Design a protein with these regions (language model features):
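Conserved glycine-rich cofactor-binding loop
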Residues: 45, 52-54
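A short, exposed helix-loop element centered on a Lys and neighboring polar residues
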Residues: 163-164, 217
Length: 313
């Protein structure tokens, strides 16, 4: 999954990083939490960072629609968290919701948020590392060092914190649901198609997202035997507040709804894609067509990051 971009339009290289399946831009039946995935989250506790707006908020609401026992959300704005909590309660009064203000780069705050979630609701079945950061793009030699590095702090350190502190509870979840003949212990890491591309001036965002994909693979290597299912996902091109920091000529690619990503995450947490653990997946991909490619993906070890070299003849 290596971009061949050498100049011109970097988006042209996306086709080299994509599956030949139908692409979706809005919610559709197979990932709809009110139809195909109705009650799929019943009895489960969902932990979401960056859960107060955009994709995180849509994901929290989607899990409520899918019948989650509880949704725990974190973000830095208490007012936005309260608004999302109210929205979840309106969506499904039977889904409990709690929140805490939290900076994902702060070790103590993430640990405290995870502990609070477990104290309130008894565990964690799905952890979604959704919080992100995107500043104005700049060439490496013209970038702000503090801002450039903060992208890594928010994406990698933030995801690591979620993984590290939720892991014991996710392992418990995986075992508990397996004993019931079902699936638990799901971990979602927010990546991007940009992880596979080379956009001039996007080095901080795209390198950190590329590292997310590798981190996902390591979770699978270290904890796959514990029943953990981890996915690094491209949520689609969503016109979030952060995305507006991209150059304006990229805005035309922001055509996907946050509900698409949210439904895709609920689908992943349902156990239907457990076979694809440790891999990069896109919310745009039709899930039924993706599933039809299971044997090929596993046989050829696709949707992972590897160095491509020419074999000796």
């Amino acid at each position: 999954m290596i971009s061949n971009f050498k100049g011109g339009d970097p988006m042209a290289s996306i086709d080299n990083q994509d599956l030949s399946v139908t692409k979706h831009h809005t919610l559709y039946d197979a990932i709809d939490p009110t139809s195909a995935l109705k009650s799929s989250a019943s009895g489960k506790v969902i932990f979401i960072t960056g859960g107060s707006q955009g994709i995180g908020q849509a994901t929290a609401v989607a899990f409520a629609k899918a019948g989650a026992k509880a949704v725990y959300i974190t973000a830095r704005s208490e007012q936005a968290l309260k608004e999302t909590q109210d929205l979840i309660r309106q969506t499904n009064p039977d889904t409990q919701c709690a929140y805490s203000t939290c900076d994902v780069t702060n070790t103590a705050q993430v640990e405290a948020a995870v502990s609070d979630c477990v104290d309130r609701f008894g565990g964690i079945d799905v952890a979604d590392a959704n919080a992100g950061y995107l500043d104005k793009w700049a060439k490496i030699g013209e970038s702000d060092p503090k801002s450039w590095w903060y992208a890594w702090e928010a994406h990698i350190k933030g995801a690591y914190h979620v993984i590290r502190f939720s892991m014991p509870y996710l392992i418990e979840s995986a075992k508990r649901w397996a004993d019931k003949g079902s699936s638990g212990g799901h971990l979602i890491l927010l990546s991007s198609i940009g992880a596979q591309l080379l956009f001039p001036t996007a080095s901080d965002y795209q390198t950190s997202k590329h590292a997310i994909n590798r981190l996902c693979e390591f979770v699978n290597v270290d904890h796959g035997q514990d029943g953990i299912k981890c996915f690094a996902i491209h949520p689609g091109g969503v016109a979030t507040e952060l995305a507006r920091n991209m150059p304006e000529d990229h805005y035309s690619y922001l055509t996907d709804t946050p509900e698409l990503a949210a439904g895709f995450i609920v689908w992943l947490a349902s156990g239907k894609a457990d076979w694809a653990t440790g891999r990069f997946l896109s919310a745009n991909w039709d899930v039924e067509e993706l599933t039809s490619l299971k044997d090929e993906i596993l046989r050829d070890d696709l949707l992972v990051n590897r160095l491509r070299v020419r074999a000796d003849s």
